């Protein structure tokens, strides 16, 4: 029914995670227009070092999450950075961090980072710690080596195929919109996050974005934003983990979920590589030049965002 699609679109657009992305516009206000690849805008910035491309990125973790679950926040700090590096088609090399809080909070954060470091096979090589009795903060930063052309959102273009690559094994947290897969996926996650660099090096995929705090459709809108491409997504084409509602899945931060684009004819190679690792591959359609991200139930269609007149990040 059309009213259900309208309600779904309204729920997505009004979610705190989507609305929070609008604050990124202050970066443009201060630093000026972004070229997306070497400035603010993409999942990571590309820095050329000795003829090699290095991806640099960083993440700040929600203070309320650090207070509630410092160990989980430490895990998330590594996860978010590793996924950002992967989304650029790079192999993660190292993590550094900044931690502020009471002694036991800092210990729990670092223990979470140590756990995730082992899971993803990425060392935590340094950082900064400030002991504070009444303040908590956590940020982490990563570098990665990009062996091929970066999977930048600037490479998104009409005619490319769009797919969701994801791990559907996991359990949704009750307190925060996170879908961890560590118990279910374990050490396979280290290879999972390196898959995108392999697909990029083989020329299979053109661009990518990890599904993060903006949720599935917010992340997709951000992928389409720099080149003003459009897409029509059939809601029944989106795979959803068992025991999770579509609405919760659409708004959560999964442990492993990436939106990827590729040239027509590359879908089979991408699918084989993804499913060969036991991950889910879901084709979501073909990108167009409309600048509109639309949702459809195959009978009715609603516009979630028209990037010709609206913006997600303001960059």
Locations of regions flagged by a protein language model:
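Extreme N-terminal cap/leader segments of soluble proteins
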Residues: 1-66, 88, 97, 107, ...
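Acidic, Ser/Thr/Pro-rich beta/coil linker or hinge segments at domain junctions
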Residues: 2-4, 275-315
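General beta-strand structural signal in soluble alpha/beta enzymes
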Residues: 36-40, 55-57, 123-127, 142, ...
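Glycine-rich anion-binding loops of enzyme active sites
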Residues: 53-56, 61-63, 91-175, 286, ...
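Small-aliphatic-rich amphipathic alpha-helix that forms the alpha element of a beta-alpha
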Residues: 69-95, 108-119, 192-200, 216-222
């Amino acid at each position: 029914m059309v009213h259900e699609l309208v309600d779904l679109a309204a729920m997505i657009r009004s979610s705190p995670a989507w609305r929070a992305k609008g604050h990124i516009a202050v970066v443009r206000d201060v630093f000026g227009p972004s070229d997306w690849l070497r400035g603010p805008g993409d999942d990571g910035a590309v820095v050329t070092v000795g003829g090699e491309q290095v991806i640099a990125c960083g993440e700040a973790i929600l203070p309320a999450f650090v207070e509630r679950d410092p160990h989980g926040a430490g895990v998330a700090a590594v996860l978010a950075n590793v996924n950002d590096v992967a989304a650029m088609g790079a192999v993660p090399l190292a993590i550094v961090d900044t931690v502020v809080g009471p002694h036991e909070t800092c210990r729990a954060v670092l223990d979470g980072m140590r756990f995730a470091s082992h899971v993803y096979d990425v060392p935590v090589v340094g950082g900064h710690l400030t002991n504070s009795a009444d303040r908590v903060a956590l940020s982490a930063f990563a570098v990665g080596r990009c062996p091929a052309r970066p999977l930048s959102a600037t490479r998104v273009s009409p005619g490319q195929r769009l797919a969701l690559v994801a791990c559907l094994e996991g359990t949704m947290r009750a307190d925060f919109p996170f879908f961890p897969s560590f118990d279910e996926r374990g050490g396979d996650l280290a290879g999972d996050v390196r898959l995108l660099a392999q697909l990029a090096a083989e020329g299979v995929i053109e661009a990518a974005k990890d599904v993060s705090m903006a949720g599935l459709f917010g992340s997709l809108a951000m992928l389409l934003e720099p080149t003003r491409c459009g897409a029509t997504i059939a809601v029944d084409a989106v795979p959803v983990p068992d025991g999770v509602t579509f609405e919760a899945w659409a708004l959560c931060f999964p442990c492993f979920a990436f939106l990827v684009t590729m040239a027509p004819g590359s879908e089979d190679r991408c699918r084989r590589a993804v499913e060969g690792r036991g991950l889910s591959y879901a084709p979501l359609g073909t990108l167009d030049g409309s600048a509109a991200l639309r949702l459809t139930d195959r009978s009715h269609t609603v516009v979630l965002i028209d990037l010709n007149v609206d913006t997600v990040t303001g960059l």
